[in-house]
Every structure is written in C-alpha cells, then in structure tokens.
Amino acid sequence: MKIFWMNAPRWLSTLIYVGMGWLDRKDVLQWIDWVLAQDSEAEIVLHGVSMGAATTMMTAGEDTPEQVKVFVEDCGYTSVWDIFSSELKLRFGLPEFPILYTASATARAKAGYGFKEASALQQVQNCEKPMLFIHGTADDFIPYEMMGTLYNAKPGTNKATLTAEGAGDGCSG
C-alpha cells in the first residue's frame, strides 16, 4: 500500500491554514493510524520534500508506532521561523522585526502555533528511528547548511546524509 501525502489545507486535510509542517504532522499521524487499521503489519517509510520534509521531521519527533521504520527528508528546513527569516533577508533584504514577529503572533492567534514552536530541529532531537537527510547544494530556497544542523541535532548513529551536487530545492532525489 502506498499513500502520497500533500501538505494542503482544506481539500486534502482537516486543516484550514497552511501549517508549514507543524499542523500537518497531526494529519500524518492519523494517516499512519489508518494504514495500521488496514494492515497492522505494515512497514511504513515517511518521506517528504521541502515543506513535506519538514512535515516528515516534525512527525519524527512524535510518538510513532513501531511499524514506522524510517524517515527520509529531502531539503527540509530547521524551523518555520528560520526559513521565513532566511527568505525575508535573501529575497527582500528585510529584518525579522517587525514582520516576522507580527506574522508569528498572527499565526498563533489564527492557526494555534508560533513560528519558533514549529521546529523540525527540536523534533529531530526526539527521534530515535533512522533518518536520511538529503539536500541539494544549489537550493536557493532552503539553505543547504540547514541539512548539517538537522543531522547534528538527531541523536544516535542511525542517520545519514546525501548531498545532491548542483540540485535545487525539491530536485535532490
């Protein structure tokens, strides 16, 4: 059985707001439960690209059933705060304050989460299962350096990196 998940509010999910992976992780956990209700012996691999990679890592920090065997993230970001901060600087030459602070407060009020809370970096620190980190060196959206930060945050030795030379965002695999 294969399930392909797309981070998208309303039409594929119970979400109203784009959760940048943070809200979406709860939907993924429900899909895992559904798969296991169909086949209790299923072996599950979670894989995501870009925002899907963040969703994968954010899910990895939750209590997942033993049937979830491995996580594969391809060009994910460390946190919502970090990726928005990077984009503000890179694309617009703007500082974090006041825009990012205001946007994070608005997200907390409307969607129930703040941008610093929505952290793949914090979640991978709770992951005991194997994880593969993939990133392209020519990614001009999510900084390549975030892969190393995420890799170093994951405890244990059951982890690996794969660098895709010259690949952009979402083109590593």
Annotate the PLM regions.
Residues 151-172:
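Catalytic histidine neighborhood in serine/cysteine hydrolases
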Residues 126-128, 133-135, 139:
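Short beta-strand/loop motif that positions the catalytic acidic residue
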Residues 48-52, 56:
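Gly/Ala-rich beta-loop-alpha elbow adjacent to hydrolase catalytic centers
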Residues 137-142, 169-170:
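Acidic catalytic loop of the alpha/beta-hydrolase fold
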Residues 9-39, 43:
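Catalytic nucleophile-loop/oxyanion-hole region of alpha/beta-hydrolase
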